[in-house]
Amino acid sequence: TKIETRTEPMVLNMGPHHPSMHGVLRLIVTLDGEDVVDCEPVIGYLHRGMEKIAESRTNIMYVPYVSRWDYAAGMFNEAITVNAPEKLADIEVPKRAQYIRVIMLELNRIANHLLWLGPFMADVGAQTPFFYIFREREMIYDLWEAASGMRLINNNYFRVGGVAVDLPYGWNDKCEDFCDYFLPKVDEYEKLITNNPIFRRRVEGVGTVTREEAINWGLSGPMLRGSGVKWDLRKVDHYECYDELDWEVQYETAGDCFARYLVRIREMRESVKIIRQALKAMPGGPYENLEAKRLQEGKKSEWNDFQYQYIAKKVAPTFKIPAGEHYVRLESGKGELGIFIQGNDDVFPWRWKIRSADFNNLQILPHILKGVKVADIMAILGSIDIIMGSVDR
Amino acid sequence: MTSGIDLQNSFLQSLQGFGLPPGLAKLFWIPLPSILMIIGATVGVLVVVWLERKISAAAQQRIGPEYAGPLGVLQPVADGIKLVFKEDVVPAKADPWLFTLGPVLVVLPVFLSYLIVPFGQNLVITDINVGIFLWIALSSIAPIGLLMSGYASNNKYSLLGGLRAAAQSISYEIPLSLAVLAIVMMSNSLSTIDIVDQQSGYGILGWNIWRQPVGFLIFWIAALAECERLPFDLPEAEEELVAGYQTEYAGMKFALFYLGSYVNLVLSALVFSVLYLGGWDFPIPLENVANWLGVAPTTSWLQVLMAALGITMTVLKSYFLIFIAILLRWTVPRVRIDQLLNLGWKFLLPVALANLLITAALKLTFPMAFGG
């Protein structure tokens, strides 16, 4: 007769207190030795009722609040928060404001991907890149601080019809400096990480999502593009002024953690490309003597033109969201960030449904965790790029 | 080969000079080397901890410890003192006996292994015939302690960490022993003194690293795995198992694990320098130089100089290796458990076996160069 050892599966509770649970995600993992048999994510530890709060705030009251959804990407949250009533009320945004928005969003995309890269590398065991990404991210925060007065969150920069303030004097030069500084740093990351044999073995072929699966599970962002779908809302929806800039959608076909890594690294480079063009093409130029020019040349000044303003119209506290409903979305660093807004001809929205990218991307986790090793849980979870503030809202 | 300084004899003779009987003099001598070794090992650990923090800080563009003493050199001492005064927590439903015994079993063999580390011709606690074998034998006790503490903690992470530690130690002991065996075959001895003696005489060219280019790589990888250093720190992988078998430990028991792992690192570096880098041997054959200059090898100042140089060389070589280990730790990601075991069993083991066979063949073919 054959002798065999029978082992009972072990149920391991990972999180919400666990060094690599990216906040307060809880995974109930069933293990057979080192193999994952099943995994059940438990979410909601950071639920703060963001949607309900929106229903009792005017837009201008709500904007400072929204950077707590996805606290690694506050600008995206602010952008979608003002885009929703803008699209519903058909408010036109000046070109200059659009360019400023695009620059801010792309800076945020870089910051978002940087804050993905560090923890992801830590998840596979390399602690050092975490410190490098902070070095670069600080510079983006310096730029934000100069423009909006705040660094990580609470930028409170986006307004219905434009942005809160124009860029300060010399900001464009500093931003250009950052672009010059940043690209060699990306090369540095790639030198350290991309061809590291241990890293490659840890992420290649791990957590593979096929093209069909990615579409069927409603994935978006780098998760979707890593699986070979060339889908980027910046190209698809033509929002802001992305159409006027020359850039490519980065995608990979392998669908594993390494493909997602590659997509994000290339998107950082692509973002730098976008920022550089936007800085050059910004209507009204880089220097903020527009106000002086307007005063000097009087009312008929070409600088008084609509497109040269940073905001179409200061939003009144009594701005009423018109009756009607609309789904507005944009491409955040994590994927499709959308708002389903229902107006009731009131200063408050009647319904404010947030479709966050990482909440939808996280759904596939139990599915791709089956049969992997314990260590792969972290690599796969890290590659999804979740922020629990955005998952739980 | 000159015998150099013999501390034991000089000590005994000086005590007898005070009128003590030889037996009593011997009794005075006995605890001295052990105390010296424990102090030496502990100070070595403090230095390594400081180095680890400073080098990792440099790699990560931080400053590292800087307030405790000049350049923060006292930081490890401060950490140690803090750990001593911390509450000793034993988790509920843990097995208190095994829980306490685990760290002890991990630390003791590592300190014991210092018995066989030579710093000079006579600067070794015991020159036993089975020297290097004793180290290998002692190092396989540690996983029992790790498994014990992992099992006794009543924590699933600890259990997984303990099991990983056991699997890892067993898998990497074999290639490690085979690499050592190749050296032993060339030296015709298991004694660490003989192994160094056999390498000396030709300066840096005589060191085993040239004759064992594959062996030293195997040894280094296996030694890193035995020390549970990144990229092989799976038993305590923070991102996966929180802290592995150490999860439930606090205070002095945790400090024992910490101490044990660093003592083990220093020890592995010392053994590596003994096996492959000529131990206390200077890169230039100094004895020939002394002969050439016409200084007799028995001159006392020359002997003191050589002994001091020997200790410096051994320590320098080991700290160079420790530096590499630290830099590696802060550069590379961690391997996965199946990759770790595959590397051990499917790659290192056959390569180590082949290395042993080739060494044997070379020894038969070129007895001059390979210690026939």
UniProtKB/Swiss-Prot annotation, chain B:
GO terms for biological process: aerobic respiration; photosynthesis, light reaction. InterPro entries: NADH_UbQ_OxRdtase_su1/FPO (IPR001694), NADH_UbQ_OxRdtase_su1_CS (IPR018086). Its EC number is 7.1.1.-. It catalyses: a plastoquinone + NADH + (n+1) H(+)(in) = a plastoquinol + NAD(+) + n H(+)(out); a plastoquinone + NADPH + (n+1) H(+)(in) = a plastoquinol + NADP(+) + n H(+)(out). GO terms for cellular component: plasma membrane-derived thylakoid membrane. It is found in: Cellular thylakoid membrane. It is a multi-pass membrane protein. Keywords: Membrane, NAD, NADP, Plastoquinone, Quinone, Thylakoid, Translocase, Transmembrane, Transmembrane helix. It comes from the Bacteria. The chain crosses the membrane at residues 29-51, 98-120, 130-152, 165-187, 202-224, 254-276, 305-327, 340-362. Its main location: membrane. Pfam families: NADHdh. GO terms for molecular function: oxidoreductase activity, acting on NAD(P)H, quinone or similar compound as acceptor; quinone binding. NDH-1 is composed of at least 11 different subunits. PANTHER family: NADH DEHYDROGENASE SUBUNIT 1 (PTHR11432), NADH-UBIQUINONE OXIDOREDUCTASE CHAIN 1 (PTHR11432:SF3). Belongs to the complex I subunit 1 family. NDH-1 shuttles electrons from an unknown electron donor, via FMN and iron-sulfur (Fe-S) centers, to quinones in the respiratory and/or the photosynthetic chain. The immediate electron acceptor for the enzyme in this species is believed to be plastoquinone. Couples the redox reaction to proton translocation, and thus conserves the redox energy in a proton gradient. This is NAD(P)H-quinone oxidoreductase subunit 1. It comes from Synechocystis sp. (strain ATCC 27184 / PCC 6803 / Kazusa). The lineage of its organism: Bacteria, Bacillati, Cyanobacteriota, Cyanophyceae, Synechococcales.
